[in-house]
Amino acid sequence: MKRTVIAILLVFCLGVTQPALACTTILVGKAASADGSVMVSHSDDGLNDASMIYVPAQDHKPGAMRAVYYSHAALDFKPQWGATISHRIVTRERGPNYDIKDVPPSVPLGYIPQVAHTYAYFDANYGIMNEHQLSIGECTDKAKVHPEPEPGKRIFYSAELSRVALERTKTAREAIRLMGELIEKYGYYGTGETLLVADPHEGWVMEMAGYDMNGAGGVWVAQRVPDDQMFVAANQFRIRDIRANAEDMMYSANIFEIARAKGWWTPESGPLDFARVYGDGEFHHPYYSLRRVWRAQSLAAPSLGLSPWAEGPFTRAYPFAVTPDKKLTVGDIFAIHRDNYEGTEFDLTKGLAAGPFGDPNRFEGNAEGMADKEGKLTPAIGEFERPLNIYRCVYAHVNQSRSWLPDAIGGVVWFGPDRPATAVLMPFYAGATDLPIPIQKADILKFDRQSMWMAFNYVANYSMLKYSYMIKDIHAVRDRFETGAFERQPKLEAEALALWSKGDQAGARERLTRYSDQNARVILTDWWKLASNLYLKYNDGYLNTQKAIADPVFYPAWWLKQVGYEDGPTSYAPKGKRE
């Protein structure tokens, strides 16, 4: 019995660490977008710190050093590096919004020389966008080696790399070169990573990995996304053959040497396939990544007729990037993140697992085992499809970088709290002087009605009780806010541009900051109203309105048949003796 309990606890502990290893990220070139913007999106699909933080621009004294902190997203929370499981960074160095009282401060893994001036940026579990419209997206990948952090040898993970890039650079190429130099000089730890890096003119994919559990340095490669195409990554390396001296590629000087030394590749075998040589396929199970890549590419370019089935994890059936059938908008990109495979053979709103009310959410973990006569657990074998929209997402965003506008106005982060299917996109401008407090308050272990994430997570969780009904109410409110935001965008930006053109840059920034703050606060208030309305309308399983109270909402016939409704107490005779 003791062994059985230990086994169950071990399974549980292993299971709860898995969600950190999952995100989806998309990049759209300027000729593939409807308005000429370069767009980057990211869904952060691990239940952790859900806040988006404003980090102000700062001036630094000569000789100052910049602390490099451990990232929980790399290898899960490690208490020796400070902060808490629900606070990613706690420090005064990055402005007042990371200076959190009564929480253990973050402990540096190491330091690098500071520069004289650092730019303002929006930060979350990875950097998002800086004041110069430099934009970041991310997903975790399964590499052959996931080294632990070690001061003096391996102090950088993608999260801190992205922040340094936003602090110090203005273009995608500058950012990639800087992050590459930091990997090579200070070492890389953690999982493999994909970072999407974009500016108002172009977008690149950068992928990185460690190569030795006790080594220093790391390897990295970057590839430019064609202007007329869309790229997607979903927890698996996507860069394949490295082409020496190609104008659309950059890579670390050691990338060939390390692969040869490890016995992972030889020049005689052909071009170095980064995904195969340094990667280890998909996380968790087959199609954990590939199904999302197929779906995103199919939604953007259905004319390609891509098959959802592949011969293995390193298939070349899905191109590096695709030309969309039509120019894409912010809404189009977020619609991809909201997808649950609706209308396909993998539709998560259908079938017995979706329940009587079409709930697409499938909780992950290890299936409960059956004990044999000796008490040995035999686990149930199987998996659910992994959708683009997932219940454990803490936030998602679509970034716009636009070359024809001043950076302060041209850069927009459309931020959606919690899972995409029930989120509302809210605009925040690169020139903002702060972010709304409800966006920056997101302790997932504290019930707080002033937290934007808490409001959205509350509604999302409650909707699972009667999803096919409640999602319509949720989308009605969502669409009202999003339609309004998109319709107001041209007028708002024209007003800000007029102020900017007159030399009143502070006034333009204040106008954008105030608008975003007011919009967010109205949404927060109305979302809690929505939560109350859903509770009253569907209380006790009924439909309650001004027309009728306790109006029954019964189960569909197909589901009743599946769960044995017909075998219920319809007769006094035993089940086997009924006529």
Language-model features and meaning:
Residues 148-152, 160-169:
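Second-shell loop/turn segments in exported
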Residues 1-4:
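Positively charged n-region of N-terminal signal peptides that target proteins for export
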